[in-house]
């Protein structure tokens, strides 16, 4: 059975952030705390989005009045899955059970050689 790299995105709310950089750091740290020590192999990063006007890449963070919405990306390797859909379900289940109130969406599933 093949192995897969599953990429998920999540919307993370950060309260009392002093800056956009602060919000990004807090979001990654809080997500890491929820996943460790069980899933310390999951890579966590802030996602990117494109500017609607000039199409240049921007970090996926929106901040108003000290409250930020940070788009996080989770990358997880899933071994011995039956199909890409099965790998996505496994990754979403494993990450989701540690973050029950965080919305997760699968954005990519790629087979690993």
Curated annotation (Swiss-Prot):
Protein name per the record: UPF0212 protein AF_0282
Pfam families in UniProt: DUF555
Family: Belongs to the UPF0212 family.
InterPro entries: UPF0212
Lineage: superkingdom: Archaea
